[in-house]
Structure formats: C-alpha cells, structure tokens
C-alpha cells in the first residue's frame, strides 16, 4: 500500500504502512496527520488508514527524493521456472511487458517535458504525473527482477508495487529545485558520462554473475546471496540515476548500489 501524507501544506510520499507506523512510533508523525491512499475518496487521519499500532523497531524511512529498492532473496528457487524463462521467456515474459513499456515510454517523454516546465515556473512537480512516472518504474523493476532470475513468479501487469517481494519507493520532495531543473539540460555530461562508465563495468560483471547464478539455481536451487545483492545493487544504482535525470529527485545519485 502506498500512503501519501499532508505535511506543511504539501502532499509528500509515498510511504509504506511500516514506514508510517515507524514515524508514529518515533513521534515524528501526529495521529491526526491527514493521509491518503488511491482507494480513498478523500483524506483521512493517518491512524484510520494504518491503525493505531506503531512499530518501534528500525524501519527504513526514506528522505526526500531518496530511492529505496528491494528485491527479496528467496531461500530456494524453482528449476522449472528457471528453464521456462530461459527457453520461452522471450514469448511469455519479455514481449508482452516490453510492448507495454514501449507505449508507456512515449507517455513518459511527454510527462518529462511537462514536469520540466512545471518545476521551472512553479517549483513543483505535478503530483499526478509524479505518481504516474514512479508507478511505471515500479512496474519495470518488478519485471526486470524476473528477467534477471532474481525472483520466481510471473510479474503482474499494472502500475505500482504489487506486494510480491519486489518494491521501489521514491519519497516525493515537497519542493523541487529550479536550479537542478535547468542543470538537467547538461545531465548527459555530469550524470551520464561518470555514472554510465561505472555502470558499464558493473553491467559486464552483472552478465557474468547472471550466467553463474543461472547454473547455481539449476544445480542447487539457491541463488548465492552476495551475487543477488550485487545484481539488485545494479538495479538500485540505475534507478537512482533515472530518478535524478527524470526529475523525480534532486539528489545527485551516489556512486554505489548499496541501500
């Protein structure tokens, strides 16, 4: 569930239920704070949405513009699904989703154009467009996790997270920088070149680990945790770069795939 909060006159989020409960437990969020979920017709008190229970254990709460990406590491993987993806994946896994992403890619280009001018003139990224773009990326991460054999199961069609062990969140900033907006014109130079060079070598290593992981699952039904973490780190690093380039975040992406 993706929850948005109304703080300091701005809609911020999305957050997960666990993150909201952690904020309630830490006292950084008042029980009467207004919250909203896409299934609700109007804003309600946050405790009505997540209940009065507050968790006190450590839960990762992203700062503004921070990208949080998770792919669950399974204790065991299915050999049958692995072989199905290897021999028939292009038919039932790659082509159907890729066709959707081609169409969505056209829409995303228009969204980026609208968002750029909106930030330049108003200092704000339209909330509806922000949610749409984020939801497309959440779908793509869910799909790519299966293509890369990091998760079993078929990725659900549709926008947003689906609670299937793969999730990606970007905490929407309350204010967007016009300066960063203008700087995006030069993003291919100061973002694309340094990060592209690093990711090129990471992706080469990722291809080698993809093959190694395939045979590890085939013979042992287990995907080595360190290899899984590295591959997820590639996704996380790439998504941070995409979030900055597409103005979902003003945080310059770190040169790391670590959480």
Locations of the language-model features?
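Protein-protein interaction regions
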Residues: 1-72
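Membrane-proximal intrinsically disordered regions of secretory-pathway and membrane-system proteins
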Residues: 58-259
């Amino acid at each position: 569930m993706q929850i948005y909060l109304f703080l300091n006159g701005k809609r911020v989020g999305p957050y997960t239920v666990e993150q909201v409960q952690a904020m309630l437990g830490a006292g950084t969020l008042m029980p009467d704070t207004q919250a909203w979920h896409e299934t609700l017709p109007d804003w309600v008190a946050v405790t009505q949405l997540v209940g009065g229970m507050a968790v006190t254990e450590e839960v990762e709460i992203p700062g503004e513009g921070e990208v949080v990406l998770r792919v669950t590491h399974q204790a065991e993987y299915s050999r049958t699904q692995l072989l199905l993806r290897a021999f028939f994946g292009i038919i039932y896994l790659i082509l159907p989703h890729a066709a959707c992403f081609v169409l969505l890619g056209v829409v995303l280009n228009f969204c980026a154009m609208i968002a750029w001018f909106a930030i330049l003139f108003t200092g704000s990224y339209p909330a509806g467009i922000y949610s749409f773009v984020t939801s497309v990326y959440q779908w793509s991460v869910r799909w790519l996790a299966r293509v890369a054999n990091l998760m079993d199961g078929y990725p659900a069609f549709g926008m947003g997270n689906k609670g299937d062990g793969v999730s990606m969140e970007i905490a929407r900033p309350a204010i967007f920088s016009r300066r960063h907006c203008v700087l995006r014109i030069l993003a291919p130079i100061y973002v694309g070149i340094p990060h592209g060079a690093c990711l090129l070598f990471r992706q080469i290593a990722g291809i080698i680990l993809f093959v190694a992981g395939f045979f590890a699952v085939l013979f042992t039904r287990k995907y080595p945790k360190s290899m899984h973490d590295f591959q997820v780190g590639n996704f996380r690093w790439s998504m941070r770069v995409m979030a900055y380039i597409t103005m979902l975040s003003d945080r310059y992406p770190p040169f790391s795939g670590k959480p």
